[in-house]
Every structure is written in structure tokens, then in C-alpha cells.
């Protein structure tokens, strides 16, 4: 279990380098990745939910009930935003501590990745070159057919499609062959990288069991500290939600009562 926890931590922490590894972008810290993903997700949910609430309030039923859901939604969004601001520094501290504890292991894995990259780069370059050649060959074969279509207009469209079909299938088959060849070439390096990671973890487990235990203990300690520091912010969120929920409950009961009176009077 400890090895699994450490593996996930290492993969997560080194994952921030993956985009830099293949695309040569600036590396992004783990917290930045988590924060960006969480922010996008929360914003999408918040905006989408607000749109649905606004549509409901604009409907005939929404106007009749007059629940003031949009006001409550905005209050809730404000409370959640406040929670994010309060927890942000605490979570940042957690990731900073975890990064420090796994710095040595991440450096070793970065060296392994760089070594594998140098070995597989020629295969990637060769694949890209062959793919460009196939596309250019396909373009040269298709070009005369395009001119033929312009000359013959619509009556030759079906004939053109019949001629293009085998060419497209040929391109697909040749591309598939190149992909299979690339996969076969890269397989040993992928396995080599997996074995190196397993060896790193096994070395920690056997030759440095104390270090692995220490990683796990410190991670647990950081998580406990995170929970304790987040409690006040979560309590603030709960207190902020109470008026919103009470307002919603009162509005709903009033709407139901009014609807009942109208039904009884008919």
C-alpha cells in the first residue's frame, strides 16, 4: 500500500513535467495543474448551473413560484469563492511540502525520462518524416482527381468518390503500418522506463525501507495538517449556506401555500 501511495505521488508530481518533456513548454507545478483544472471545472459548473436557474426563473412556473433562486445562487457562488480563497494557501503549503519530500526521487525519474527521450527521438522523427511522405503522396494522387471533378462537375462526383475510396484506404493502411512499426520500436523503451520506476521503488522499499516509511508518514502528516487548517473555512461555508438554505425553504413553503390557496379557491 505504501508503494502504491508513493507511486501515485511520484507520477502526479512528475506528471507536471510531461508536457514540458514532449512539447518543450514551461513546466507547470502540480498545484498549478490541480488549481487550473479545479477552477475550470467549478467555473463551468457554476456558469452552467446559473444559466439553468435563470431559465427556470424566466419560465411561467418560475415567475409564479417566485423562489428567488438566482439571488440564492449568487449568494452560494460568493460563499464558495470565499472558501476557495481561504483553502488555497493551505493546499499550496501541502503540495510544497510533498514536493520537497520527493525531490530526490523526482530528479532521478527526470533523468530516466530524459535518457529515454534521447533514445526514442530518432524513431519519432522517422515516423513524422514517413507520415509527411505518405500525406504528400496521397495529395499528389488526389490532385488530378480534383481537376477532373472541376471539369466534369456534378456528374462525375460519384465516379470521383469511387476513385478516392481506395486511395483513402491505402493511406489508412500505410499509416496503420507505420504506427504499428513505431509502437514496436518504442515498446522496449516503455518497458525499460516501467522497470526503472519499479526498481527505484523496490530500492526504496528494500534498501531504504525507513525512507519509504518516512515518505508515507510525512504525507499522512501533511494531509492531517491540511484537514485541520481547512476546518475553519469549511465551517464558514456551512454557516454561509444556512441563510441561503433557510431563505430557499421559506420561499418554497410560501409558494406552495399560495398555490394551495389558489387551488382551494377555484
From Swiss-Prot:
Gene: APOA1
Pfam family, one: Apolipoprotein
Entry keywords, A to Z: Cholesterol metabolism, Glycoprotein, HDL, Lipid metabolism, Lipid transport, Lipoprotein, Oxidation, Palmitate, Phosphoprotein, Repeat, Secreted, Signal, Steroid metabolism, Sterol metabolism, Transport
Name of the protein in question: Apolipoprotein A-I
Positions annotated as Sequence repeat: 67-88, 89-110, 111-121, 122-143, 144-165, 166-187, 188-209, 210-231, 232-242, 243-266
KW Lipoprotein (keyword) present: yes
Sites bearing Methionine sulfoxide, chain numbering: 109
InterPro entries: ApoA_E (IPR000074), Apolipoprotein_A1/A4/E (IPR050163)
Any one GO MF annotation of this record: phosphatidylcholine-sterol O-acyltransferase activator activity
Family of the protein in this entry: Belongs to the apolipoprotein A1/A4/E family.
Domain of life: Eukaryota
UniProt key word Transmembrane: no
Subcellular location: Secreted
Signal peptide: 1-18
Renumbered residue ranges of the record's region 10 X approximate tandem repeats: 67-266
Biological process annotations from GO: acylglycerol homeostasis; cholesterol efflux; cholesterol metabolic process; lipoprotein metabolic process; phospholipid efflux
Function: Participates in the reverse transport of cholesterol from tissues to the liver for excretion by promoting cholesterol efflux from tissues and by acting as a cofactor for the lecithin cholesterol acyltransferase (LCAT). As part of the SPAP complex, activates spermatozoa motility.
PANTHER family for the chain: APOLIPOPROTEIN (PTHR18976), APOLIPOPROTEIN A-I (PTHR18976:SF11)
Amino acid at each position: 500500500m505504501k508503494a502504491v501511495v508513493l507511486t501515485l505521488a511520484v507520477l502526479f508530481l512528475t506528471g507536471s513535467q510531461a508536457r514540458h518533456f514532449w512539447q518543450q513548454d514551461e513546466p507547470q507545478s502540480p498545484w498549478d495543474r490541480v488549481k487550473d483544472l479545479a477552477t475550470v471545472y467549478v467555473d463551468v459548473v457554476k456558469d452552467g448551473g446559473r444559466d439553468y436557474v435563470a431559465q427556470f426563473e424566466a419560465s411561467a412556473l418560475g415567475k409564479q413560484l417566485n423562489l428567488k433562486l438566482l439571488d440564492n445562487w449568487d449568494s452560494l457562488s460568493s460563499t464558495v469563492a470565499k472558501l476557495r480563497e481561504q483553502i488555497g494557501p493551505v493546499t499550496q503549503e501541502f503540495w510544497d511540502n510533498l514536493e520537497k519530500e520527493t525531490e530526490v526521487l523526482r530528479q532521478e525519474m527526470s533523468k530516466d525520462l530524459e535518457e529515454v527521450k534521447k533514445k526514442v527521438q530518432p524513431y519519432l522523427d522517422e515516423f513524422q518524416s514517413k507520415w509527411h511522405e505518405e500525406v504528400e503522396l496521397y495529395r499528389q494522387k488526389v490532385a488530378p482527381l480534383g481537376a477532373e471533378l472541376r471539369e466534369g462537375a456534378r456528374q462525375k462526383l460519384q465516379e470521383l468518390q469511387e476513385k478516392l475510396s481506395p486511395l483513402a484506404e491505402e493511406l489508412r493502411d500505410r499509416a496503420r503500418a507505420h504506427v504499428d512499426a513505431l509502437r514496436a520500436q518504442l515498446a522496449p523503451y516503455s518497458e525499460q522506463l516501467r522497470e526503472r520506476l519499479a526498481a527505484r521503488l523496490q530500492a526504496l522499499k528494500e534498501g531504504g525501507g525507513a525512507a519509504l516509511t518516512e515518505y508515507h508518514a510525512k504525507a499522512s502528516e501533511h494531509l492531517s495538517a491540511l484537514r485541520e487548517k481547512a476546518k475553519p473555512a469549511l465551517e464558514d461555508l456551512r454557516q454561509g449556506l444556512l441563510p441561503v438554505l433557510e431563505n430557499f425553504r421559506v420561499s418554497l413553503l410560501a409558494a406552495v401555500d399560495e398555490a394551495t390557496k389558489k387551488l382551494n379557491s377555484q
